[in-house]
């Protein structure tokens, strides 16, 4: 039952990565019981980061922990290879990549070749990042059987889809990436890579503790509150809202997202805080 945080990337008002804020945030997540950090994922605005920024994030977080999965995905394979080689010098958990995207009707052999190239030069374990809603490609288990895959992050609202990986790829760790499926993923998979760990890490850790104790009804009650939070965040833009809610729930500032993920206006941030306040109180009652 591993809980992995796809950490946000804090930016200042000029759009530069705030390394100090990133480190502070990572330290807090680990202190709250998060097992590992997924670097440069979707929540971390990975596809919108430059090669140098991706490298900078890894460097900064490596000062905090070695429990890192380094997401290197890009349409520029030369950049991917350079990032993988850079990470080879570090003692991290593994490297990961989303599939190629944008270009329609890529044959499966191209997807397989992309991951083969990463695995060929990496000294670390390979984690597949499957996000069909974002990339347009759903990576089938069949093309992964010949690859040295350690784990799969499956960002999918269909738990049965994640279970297909589990059933067809023995020995491969499978994590679901949906906040609304945390409870069910902890029960049936190897864990979760959930964006809500950025602002309510202790809630998700509490869910795991309750499940281990056999208190499934209590864990499910927390999931209900998480799902209600998810409904609210979608109205504002989930990733943008997370930056506001880290401060609201954890008590420190993580700056701003960067366009094309625009920060909330002051009015939107205030409205969000008001809307989640009843849920915040209920969560605090159940966790503490």
From Swiss-Prot:
pH effect summary: Optimum pH is 6.5.
Keyword vocabulary terms for this entry: Carbohydrate metabolism, Lyase, Schiff base
Annotated catalytic residues: 153 (schiff-base intermediate with substrate)
Temperature optimum or stability note: Optimum temperature is around 99 degrees Celsius. Extremely thermostable.
Keyword Metal-binding: no
Recorded metabolic or biological pathway in which this protein acts: Carbohydrate acid metabolism; 2-dehydro-3-deoxy-D-gluconate degradation; D-glyceraldehyde 3-phosphate and pyruvate from 2-dehydro-3-deoxy-D-gluconate: step 2/2
Swiss-Prot/TrEMBL catalytic activity: 2-dehydro-3-deoxy-6-phospho-D-gluconate = D-glyceraldehyde 3-phosphate + pyruvate; 2-dehydro-3-deoxy-6-phospho-D-galactonate = D-glyceraldehyde 3-phosphate + pyruvate
One family name in Pfam for this protein: DHDPS
Chain positions of site Proton shuttle: 129
Top EC group: lyase
Positions with a binding annotation for substrate: 42-43, 129-131, 153-155
Listed EC numbers: 4.1.2.55
GO molecular function: 2-dehydro-3-deoxy-6-phosphogalactonate aldolase activity; 2-dehydro-3-deoxy-phosphogluconate aldolase activity; 4-hydroxy-tetrahydrodipicolinate synthase activity
Taxonomic superkingdom: Archaea
Keyword Cytoplasm: no
Role description: Involved in the degradation of glucose and galactose via the Entner-Doudoroff pathway. Catalyzes the reversible cleavage of 2-keto-3-deoxy-6-phosphogluconate (KDPG) and 2-keto-3-deoxygluconate (KDG) forming pyruvate and glyceraldehyde 3-phosphate or glyceraldehyde, respectively. It is also able to catalyze the reversible cleavage of 2-keto-3-deoxy-6-phosphogalactonate (KDPGal) and 2-keto-3-deoxygalactonate (KDGal).
Oligomeric and partner information: Homotetramer; dimer of dimers.
Family per similarity comment: Belongs to the DapA family. KDPG aldolase subfamily.
Protein name: 2-dehydro-3-deoxy-phosphogluconate/2-dehydro-3-deoxy-6-phosphogalactonate aldolase
Phylogenetic lineage: Archaea, Thermoproteota, Thermoprotei, Sulfolobales, Sulfolobaceae
